[in-house]
Amino acid sequence: MTTPAPPSFELPEELAIDTTAARRIIGEFIRAQLSQAGFGKVLLGLSGGIDSALVAYLAAEAIGPQQVLAVLMPYRTSSPESRADAETVVAELGCPSELVDISAIVDGYFEPDRTDAAPLRRGNFMARARMMVLYDHSVTWGGLVIGTGNKTETLIGYSTLWGDSASAFNPIGDLYKSQIRQLSAAMGVPQAIIAKAPSADLWPGQTDEAEVGFSYAEVDRILFRLVDRRLSIDEVVADGFERELVDRVDRMVAGSEFKRQVPPIAKIGPRTAGIDYLYPRRRPRSTRD
């Protein structure tokens, strides 16, 4: 595994986090979610990228590495370096792992009748194939699927519905990509993983930033202003950002709202699940309250 030059983790003041506090909060969150659901183990798809690597480290710290199953799910065109990075994480943490090649699943669907499918369509199918593998393994492993999506991708909709966005709970969903890098450095995630260009590895040479057309460093600062500070587009532009980019990010957030919500239900009866029949996950046993 080739180690790139160390990147800078100097974040704008508004994005810098207390990594010690974040580790404590996330560790408590993981343990609480498992306790409420009556489980003691988790599993995740380990791609070799920074997001899943960080979640593996956080989960191993919270409940012990032997309670964390890392599932490696390459496709035939996946980067060998990504698999090597994932194997490095497994070796350093000492957690159990499984290797499931999804090529037969994906190719069995697209060939021979759908060979003209666009890369994005194939990529979405691959993400959902990995979700199926994870949830099947959750039965044999006896654990909950833990999410690996970050706040940046969730807000701009850069995820596959019922694919990489599917999980029982997500410990890093409120961390922007810039903050993921900061926390990963504090956790001891391998430098090669932190420094490499983010990629969903959906097709050869694919990178996240090239696909969306902007850098995480810039979009995180815009999202923080639009979402966390609730600034208007004009106010964000006044902070020095290009209006065209701010407008585009705002449209992406608004246009992907459906990905962040459960499917709407047509209300017919007096109490409707998800509307006026709502409980925390650890709800009282009575349905009459």
Model features per residue range: what roles?
Residues T2-L44, L54, L58-E61, Q66-L72, ...:
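ATP/NTP-dependent adenylation/nucleotidyl-transfer catalytic domains that generate, transfer
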Residues G49:
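Conserved G/P- and acidic residue-centered "switch" motifs that form tight phosphate/ATP-binding loops
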